[in-house]
Structure formats: structure tokens, C-alpha cells
């Protein structure tokens, strides 16, 4: 499925995007976001700047730059929140814009040892708590 960039939440930076996540910062070829739903404490997303459907559409140089951004964010998440593992999800079945979900997993936390849920809808924070998480991530980038 290929979507129109004019209808893409990442390209249009629309209200749907802002309802789901908060932009942390721009990176070299992408943007980092904090998911508002925080069942997986510290969950982030990295979205490629250009409207491409899949990792295999990028040149080697573009792919390496994007994956360096993803790695940079996961390293910051590891330092900020100390999860046991970070799960990577790149599905794009219904939203054809290259992005990676980054879900920290904790031994005693939800779905440890299994696949993370896309949007469990259970844990939402205050603006102050979101800002604190964002600052922790930024300080480790």
C-alpha cells in the first residue's frame, strides 16, 4: 500500500500525529517522537523525513543514515530508562511512511517476552511527565 504524502500524518504533521505522539527533536534524516501512550515506559518512534514506503526504497547511504538515527534514539532510551530490551517494530501495513516503533521492555513489565501492543490505551501522563521523559531522552542523544 502506497499512500499519498498529502494524506500522510508524518508529512502533513497533522492533528492525528499530535494526538498520538510528541516530537522530541529532528535528527539527521528523520524525526524522533515520544508516544503519548506509555504502557511501555519510554516508548518512542523514529520517522524518516521523506515519504518512502519501505527501508528497501532507500539508497545504502540513506538507509545507513536512517538506521544511525534509530540507533541514536535507542541508545538514548537505554541510558534514560534502562529497559531490559528495546523491541523494534516497522509494520507500515496501513500507513506507508517509513518509521520504526521503539518499545522498551522491562522484565516485570507488560508483554515481556512477547510482542508489544500497538496502542494498549492504558497509560497516559501529564504534560510535565512527558516533558521530563523528553528531556531525559534529549540529554542522552
Segments from the language model and where they lie:
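HIT superfamily nucleotide-processing domains
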Residues: 1-141
